[in-house]
């Protein structure tokens, strides 16, 4: 029985002040299924005036939302999680169609993890406490955390549903109001989600602006109505977001690019490690900021592991992403596919060996943006394919001899987002983990991203941490109330 793929409205507007509007000019953009090129739906191309209206709505809503209790906000977050659970199959299919990732991934990861994040922040916000310190016999210091205000959030195209949850859940929990902007490549799942939860929130608490990043997204960066910016995307754009926030003298949270090292020692758990190497680079077609795109293999097991990994790559079922048995779907758009193929050519020009893959898939999948899982023997960690973020199912394999050598190579990168160590020697795992200059190190696993474990980067991979209660601090500001109980004059004047 064919699966019904008609799961979107024909057109989507903007969510401003609790109402759906076509925007000030009513111009529309189209979203396409990257697996076959079919148009999925149209959505509004917002103007500067639309962003202004959304910010004003958020500012007005903040006056009352900030006064809600943590219990009230926690109850709403749990209700949002209930909506996700009740519509899990719908959201999974919508994310798959709009993004191109396999439905087995959206069912197992994107959607349930989104629900998990709302429940997590509903829980931890109830435990947040201020402090009171008796400084001396007469002076008392009270420290409170208050919501920072209106936050502008910009989310990427690789995990639009999950990244929305990563941004929205802690901001709402902290008592902030939101103007959120998805990528123009993948706006539909957030719009559908907003439709389902709009009735749970007071007007203006959550506002959704869609359109071109170069237009409405750029305007958001410089808007004086925001008290904080939060961005997930490339390091190149992240720099501009950070500069814009600095010019406004407001804080920013930036989750940016990566070129993560997936390190395999001779004593690795072989079969599990083989799967971990695949999960590190093939999950979401390699379009993951923390993808394990640099695979370092110790010399004693190098040939055996590379040969086995190449065979596993060849067996991957690349197919229509909505089919249950598909293991790898399509890239998000033609531009991303072109970038991947460009880097394969760069690798060849540098003298790297293409072990397997490296070509666009034609035939039955020729209408979509499909590429073969690709394994490249880089020879040197200095090769461009080993240093620059490709953002696709392309991994470089590099041989190493010693622990010290691989640590040096792993850290020889401008990025520092993720990484992994595979070994049955726990002391080695801890030594190497401590030595890696990266915000997340997995040990004998990869791409596990539950709420409760902080995620974020070192170096040019970002500023701040998400998926953890410490994110509440990023959406709040500290107030100190200093009380003197002394009744007499101090005698200073």
Task: List the predicted regions and their residue ranges.
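Hydrophobic face of amphipathic alpha-helices that form TPR/SEL1-like repeat modules
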Residues: 1-34
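Conserved C-terminal structural/oligomerization subdomain of aldehyde/semialdehyde dehydrogenase
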Residues: 36-42, 263, 317, 349, ...
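Residue-level signal for inorganic ion chemistry
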Residues: 37, 73, 95, 118, ...
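Glycine-rich loop-to-alpha-helix module at the N-terminal edge of alpha/beta enzyme cores
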Residues: 38-128, 138
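Short, well-ordered beta-strand elements within core beta-sheets of diverse protein domains
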Residues: 39-46, 60-67, 153, 262-265, ...
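Structural signal for hydrophobic packing residues in well-ordered secondary-structure cores
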Residues: 62, 66, 81-88, 92, ...
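Rossmann-like NAD(P) dinucleotide-binding subdomain of oxidoreductase/dehydrogenase enzymes
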Residues: 129-272, 400
């Amino acid at each position: 029985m064919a699966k019904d793929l008609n799961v979107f409205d024909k057109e989507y507007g903007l969510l401003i002040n609790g109402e759906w509007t076509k925007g000030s000019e009513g111009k529309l953009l189209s979203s396409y299924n990257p697996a076959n090129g079919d148009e999925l739906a149209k959505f509004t191309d917002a103007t500067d005036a639309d962003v202004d209206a959304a910010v004003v709505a958020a500012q007005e809503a903040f006056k009352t939302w900030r006064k809600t209790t943590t219990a009230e906000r926690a109850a709403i977050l749990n209700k949002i999680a209930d909506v996700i659970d009740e519509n899990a199959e719908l959201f999974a299919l919508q994310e798959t169609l709009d993004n191109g990732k396999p439905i087995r991934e959206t069912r197992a990861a994107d959607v349930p993890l989104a629900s998990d994040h709302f429940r997590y922040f509903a829980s931890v916000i109830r435990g947040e406490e201020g402090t009171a310190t008796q400084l001396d016999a007469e002076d008392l210091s009270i420290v409170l955390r208050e919501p920072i205000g209106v936050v502008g959030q910009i989310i990427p195209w690789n995990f639009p549903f999950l990244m929305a949850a990563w941004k929205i859940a802690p901001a709402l929990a902290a008592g902030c109001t939101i103007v959120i902007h998805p990528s123009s490549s993948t706006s539909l799942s957030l719009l559908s989600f907003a439709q389902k939860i709009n009735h749970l929130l007071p007007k203006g608490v959550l506002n959704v602006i869609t359109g071109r990043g170069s237009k409405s997204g750029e305007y958001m960066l410089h808007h004086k109505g925001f008290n904080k910016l939060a961005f997930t995307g490339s390091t190149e754009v992240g720099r501009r977001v950070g500069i814009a926030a600095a010019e406004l003298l407001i804080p920013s949270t930036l989750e940016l690019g990566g070129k993560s090292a997936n390190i395999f020692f001779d004593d690795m758990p072989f079969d599990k490690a083989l799967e971990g190497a695949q999960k590190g680079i093939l999950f979401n077609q390699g379009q993951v900021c923390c993808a394990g795109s640099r695979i370092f293999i110790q010399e004693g097991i190098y040939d055996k592991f590379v040969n086995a990994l190449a065979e596993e790559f060849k067996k991957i079922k690349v197919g229509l992403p909505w089919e249950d048995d598909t293991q790898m779907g399509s890239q998000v758009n033609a531009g991303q596919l072109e970038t991947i193929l460009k880097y394969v050519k760069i690798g060849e020009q540098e003298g790297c060996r293409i072990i397997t893959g490296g070509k666009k898939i034609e035939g039955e999948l020729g209408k979509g943006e499909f590429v073969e899982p690709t394994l490249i023997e880089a020879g040197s960690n200095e090769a461009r394919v080993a240093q620059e973020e490709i953002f696709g199912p392309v991994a470089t394999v590099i041989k190493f001899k010693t622990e010290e050598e691989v640590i040096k190579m792993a850290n020889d990168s401008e990025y520092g987002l993720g990484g992994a160590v595979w070994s049955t020697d726990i002391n080695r795992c801890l030594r190497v983990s401590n030595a890696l200059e990266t915000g997340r190190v997995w040990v004998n696993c990869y791409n596990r991203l539950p709420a409760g474990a902080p995620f974020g980067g070192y170096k040019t991979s970002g500023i701040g941490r998400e998926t953890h209660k410490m994110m509440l601090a990023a959406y709040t500001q500290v107030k100190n109330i200093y009380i003197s109980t002394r009744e007499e004059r101090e005698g200073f004047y």
